[in-house]
Design a protein with these regions (language model features):
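Short, flexible coil/turn micro-motifs enriched in small/turn-prone residues
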Residues: 9, 21, 181-184
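Hydrophobic membrane-insertion alpha-helices, especially the h-region
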Residues: 12-32
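Cytosolic-side transmembrane helix boundary signature
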Residues: 1-13
Length: 216
């Protein structure tokens, strides 16, 4: 009899532990993780950037350089070069799905030649001397898909963007200032400009759009 009572007590204790762990690990913990994730719902969904109609035009964390047909006026602010293609083509837009930093080091003659080509091409596009082109305009980032450019590179593009879009340079500079982010925590990194959000502020988006879902 004592054995049976002891067995029942142990079984009951085991069931209580099972129910408690099921409630904590199977319900409360997943609910807490879901709730924390919803605090930054946009970030959890890829930080999509939408235009005024609600269409997704990109992600604020993925830099995709706008492409303009050769010979057409260029109204866009442009990103940094995509690192994944730096060893093949100095001007290729690249594919964010497979973006990686370039494996070309500072002593690479290929990288040096590409940097020179990019500097000359950007100088011609912006109507400035090659030595005026900032370093981030001709080099890829560590990720290869940096969505930001330096305020210096944004300022270099202001006259062209203002002219093509029929805006005053002061108005475009104001938009650049409004889309310039400060250092993280006040001391980490440098000031930076999100290119996608800046182009969107100008009313410019890439010619594609993902319609919002019924719940989005």
């Amino acid at each position: 009899m004592r054995f049976l009572i002891g067995l029942l007590r142990q079984t009951w204790a085991g069931l209580l532990v099972l129910l408690a762990l099921t409630a904590v690990l199977g319900v409360l913990y997943p609910a807490a993780v879901w709730g924390v994730g919803r605090i930054g719902a946009g970030a959890a969904e890829g930080s999509p950037v939408r235009d005024t109609t609600g269409c997704v035009v990109g992600s604020r964390w993925v830099g995709v350089d706008p492409q303009v047909p050769a010979g057409d006026p260029d109204p866009f602010f442009h990103n940094r070069v995509t690192g994944s293609v730096a060893a093949q083509d100095p001007f290729a837009p690249g594919d964010p799905a497979g973006a990686l930093p370039t494996n070309q080091g500072p002593s690479s003659e290929i990288l040096a030649a590409f940097v020179t080509q990019r500097r000359n091409a950007i100088a011609a596009r912006e109507g400035v001397q090659p030595e005026s082109v900032p370093a981030d305009a001709v080099t890829g980032s560590g990720s290869g898909i940096d969505p930001h450019i330096s305020p210096a590179y944004a300022a270099l593009q202001v006259p062209r963007v203002a002219h093509v879009n029929g805006l005053s340079e002061s108005r475009v500079r104001q938009l650049v200032d409004e889309n310039t982010e400060g250092r993280q925590l006040g001391f980490l990194g440098e000031q930076r400009v999100n290119v996608l959000e800046l182009n969107l502020a100008l009313g410019l988006t890439v010619p594609r759009c993902t319609a919002p879902t019924a719940g989005g």
